[in-house]
Amino acid sequence: MSDPVFFSSVGPILLAEVAALAGAALPEGLDRELAIRGAAPLESAGPDDLAYMDNAKYAEALGLTRARACLVSPRFAARVPEGTIALVTPQPYRGFAKVLARLFPSAARPTSLFGATGVSPGSFVHPAARLEPGVVVDPGVVIGPGAEIGAETVLAAGAVIGPGTRIGRGCAVGPGASVLHALIGNRVIIHGGARIGQDGFGFAMGAGGHLKVPQVGRVIIQDDVEIGANTTIDRGASRDTIIGEGTKIDNLVQIAHNVVIGRHCVIVAQVGISGSTTLEDYVVLGGQVGVVGHLRIGMGAQIAGSSNINKDVPPGARWGGTPAKPVREWFREMTTLKRIAARERLAEDTAE
């Protein structure tokens, strides 16, 4: 359940609107004035709340819920208890997300920590920077010369926007984030502590010492990208580091110089992608995946968590392990190792 200290609901919202947002049908004869005021999990939802259910593991909780209404897939509709209104939709979780965004708009992206509007007198905006109407700038923000900030963008306390950096419209930059040498599209969310556009890790190694290679590329982030807290994206060495439209990046991810990430990829926490690697569209990297440099991961490929990628991955492949390989091969290897280990333990026990 949401804590009103942190997230205030804009409810009530009529169930008719909930159904429209979620792509659900209202039951026939339902009172058109019925509404919800909040949203909560099945087990804690009350008579003013909306819940959702799309996993058989929660069938028992569904049967006991006290929610006013519940978004469910057709297979679970008959299990909704009396007193709770079943809103049947093919995608309950996606529908629930849309309703949450309507109920709690301030939770959808970083906002001003002070509920402020306009430019705070405690910020520093260089006279040569250009801000479109509706930009919110919190105390402690620094905006360098030549930077451009699009309309309705929010820069939270302590954010640093470097010289010449361009940020599109409807974006949000969280507390303490820095954005340098970068071109940012529209509706991009950058969470607190993220670092974008700093030096890539480039050195000409040699016995006489490691000579730093100047990094003169940029970071380009396309529309509707989300970047998690404390994620780092290095600028390119001599070409650009690029994050494609709609890609979602979790917290604590490292993306090295010259990496190109396609559209609508998903990159989970603690992934490290080495320099000059390319991810095509719709790639998914599970948590703690490591990717060697100068590789290509094909469109739609999925990599299991904690895997290490040391060669190109074909489009649509599902790989896992260290070094990573097709999951069926990986599973066979693990099963074989388990059997060998069991035989060895049996032999040792027999010898004793």
Swiss-Prot record:
One of its GO terms (biological process) is lipid A biosynthetic process. The keyword Acyltransferase applies. InterPro entries: Hexapep, Hexapep_transf_CS, LpxD, Trimer_LpxA-like_sf, UDP_GlcNAc_AcTrfase_non-rep. CDD domains: LbH_LpxD. It catalyses: a UDP-3-O-[(3R)-3-hydroxyacyl]-alpha-D-glucosamine + a (3R)-hydroxyacyl-[ACP] = a UDP-2-N,3-O-bis[(3R)-3-hydroxyacyl]-alpha-D-glucosamine + holo-[ACP] + H(+). One of its GO terms (molecular function) is N-acyltransferase activity. The active site is at residue 257. It comes from the Bacteria. Catalyzes the N-acylation of UDP-3-O-acylglucosamine using 3-hydroxyacyl-ACP as the acyl donor. Is involved in the biosynthesis of lipid A, a phosphorylated glycolipid that anchors the lipopolysaccharide to the outer membrane of the cell. Belongs to the transferase hexapeptide repeat family. LpxD subfamily. This is UDP-3-O-acylglucosamine N-acyltransferase.
